[in-house]
């Protein structure tokens, strides 16, 4: 897939990508891989625990993940470009998003670059998508999600889908990534779309 996605007025689509320490690091990795293939400019910030999770759950190093992004930033760099509302971006995705980061974003703590960038999305009314990872959920988690939803945030838990009859773990992960990119109008031809149960059976 080599097609580049452009803004309506021209120019590359620009997205901020955050990765936290929640389980599911592969969602962030595959997201970056697909965004790179789509020609999207990405600005990546990785939390310290995300670095640990990447090493534990995937076969990638932090350096390899950072190389998938167009630009990378330290989580400590509160003076980075993405910390300002004047930075030109089309939105932000946090994949995966821990409950700690969810709470920080909801309360506007902005205690690191990742949560500050998310806070910027909220104040600038730009699209913010959180792939929240936790189960079961307690009342605090649910109230944080509800509050952010009321602020315009898209809560997109990376739940596996089986109606498209995935044949591998990678297909299940990619389905979530494609649904995430749909939120920004990035509709990849590789994404399987539901066309009704009979057609789905026939195409299996």
Curated annotation (Swiss-Prot):
Induction / repression: Up-regulated by salicylate via the transcriptional regulator BsdA.
Function description: Involved in the non-oxidative decarboxylation and detoxification of phenolic derivatives under both aerobic and anaerobic conditions. Flavin prenyltransferase that catalyzes the synthesis of the prenylated FMN cofactor (prenyl-FMN) for phenolic acid decarboxylase.
Top EC class, one word: transferase
Entries under HAMAP family matching the protein: ubiX_pad, ubiX_pad_yclB
Record GO biological process: catabolic process; response to toxic substance
Record-given protein name: Probable UbiX-like flavin prenyltransferase
SUPFAM superfamilies: Homo-oligomeric flavin-containing Cys decarboxylases, HFCD
Cystine crosslinks: none
InterPro entries linked: Flavin_trans-like, Flavoprotein, UbiX-like, UbiX_pad_YclB
Domain of life where this protein originates: Bacteria
Subunit field text: Homododecamer.
Any one Pfam family match given in the protein's UniProt record, by short name: Flavoprotein
EC nos: 2.5.1.129
Gene disruption phenotype: A triple bsdB-bsdC-bsdD deletion mutant no longer converts vanillin to guaiacol, the conversion stops at vanillic acid.
Additional comment: It is not known, if phenolic acid decarboxylase forms a complex composed of BsdB, BsdC and BsdD. The term subunit is often used in reference to the operon, however there is no experimental evidence to prove the existence of the complex.
Amino-acid positions noted as binding FMN in the UniProt annotation, renumbered to this chain: 21-23, 47, 98-101, 133
Keywords of this entry: Aromatic hydrocarbons catabolism, Detoxification, Flavoprotein, FMN, Prenyltransferase, Transferase
């Amino acid at each position: 897939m080599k097609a580049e996605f452009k803004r309506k007025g021209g120019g590359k689509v620009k997205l901020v990508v955050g990765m936290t320490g929640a389980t599911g690091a592969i969602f962030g990795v595959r997201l970056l891989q697909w965004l790179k293939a789509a020609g999207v400019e990405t600005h990546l910030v990785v939390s310290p625990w995300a670095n640990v999770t990447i090493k534990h759950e995937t076969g990638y190093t932090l350096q390899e993940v950072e190389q998938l992004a167009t630009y990378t930033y330290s989580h400590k760099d509160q003076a980075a470009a993405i910390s300002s509302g004047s930075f030109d971006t089309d939105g932000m995705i946090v994949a995966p998003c821990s409950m700690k980061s969810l709470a920080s974003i909801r309360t506007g703590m902005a205690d690191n670059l990742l949560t500050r960038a998310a806070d910027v999305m909220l104040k600038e009314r730009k699209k913010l998508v959180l792939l929240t990872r936790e189960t079961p959920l307690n009342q605090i988690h649910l109230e944080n999600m509800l509050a952010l939803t009321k602020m315009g945030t898209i809560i997109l838990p990376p739940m596996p889908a089986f109606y498209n009859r995935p044949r591998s773990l990678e297909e299940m992960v990619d389905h979530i990534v494609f649904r995430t990119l749909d939120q920004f109008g990035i509709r990849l031809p590789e994404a399987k779309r539901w066309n009704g149960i009979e057609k789905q059976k026939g195409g299996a």
